[in-house]
């Protein structure tokens, strides 16, 4: 159960997680969901790219922490491609500071959160949100990361 990660860094931000960090976090998501090898792209971007993508795909004219673009295979074609995660380094750093969280822990949370979106989980209604948050908390515990929702 391992992720094949295409890591693209299109950001000059400092203190980014290592490729090994992304690999461990994504492997944990796949293992938790009992999935075999899957491939995905993680792209770390600047604020402008995040804002442009968020406006184009979600109609929101502001940067966001993570965007998930699930891969949809054509009918009859089975591929182990999950899709793409686009993470805005500046937004993640700002949120970590604002929420008094360790930057590394917030990065882990955003990657786990985004990967669960790629697997079809969502938080549109309360029941979905509770399920998704519980999965995130359970996966993050493996890395000794506290419940990111405990202060909300």
UniProtKB/Swiss-Prot annotation:
Enzyme kind, highest EC tier: hydrolase
Known EC number: 3.1.-.-
Cofactors that this protein relies on: Zn(2+)
Subcellular location: Cytoplasm
Single biological process term from Gene Ontology: rRNA processing
Residues annotated as binding Zn(2+): 113, 117, 123
A GO molecular-function descriptor: zinc ion binding
Keyword Repressor found: no
PANTHER family, per the entry: ENDORIBONUCLEASE YBEY, CHLOROPLASTIC (PTHR46986:SF1)
Similarity field: Belongs to the endoribonuclease YbeY family.
NCBIfam families xref list: rRNA maturation RNase YbeY (TIGR00043)
Name of the protein: Endoribonuclease YbeY
Gene: ybeY
